[in-house]
């Protein structure tokens, strides 16, 4: 008799529990973003051998970032005054595409942990 009543109270308590507040957004740019990605994604587990030196794991992360073109957003937008070979229209198009990049968005408006998990390689 007590067990069903206890189970009902537990179910009622979990149903009445207030919803979780939205995840906090953190603005992450440059090396702060890379370090957070390593922490969130579990960087050391990426390497085939846990005995790999730290430099090798860092190199692996940087290679992965380059493959995903995420480092592009970590670098400042190209200034047409610095590179006269770039047409003005191409430069504007490049800035617009960078604004939609998830890494660039993390730097400008912030990312949640869920956003960062979407950037993980696995």
Swiss-Prot record:
GO terms for cellular component: extracellular region. It holds the Pfam family Insulin. Seems to play a role in testicular function. May be a trophic hormone with a role in testicular descent in fetal life. Is a ligand for LGR8 receptor. It is found in: Secreted. Expressed exclusively in Leydig cells of the testis. Residues 1-15 form the signal peptide. This is Insulin-like 3.
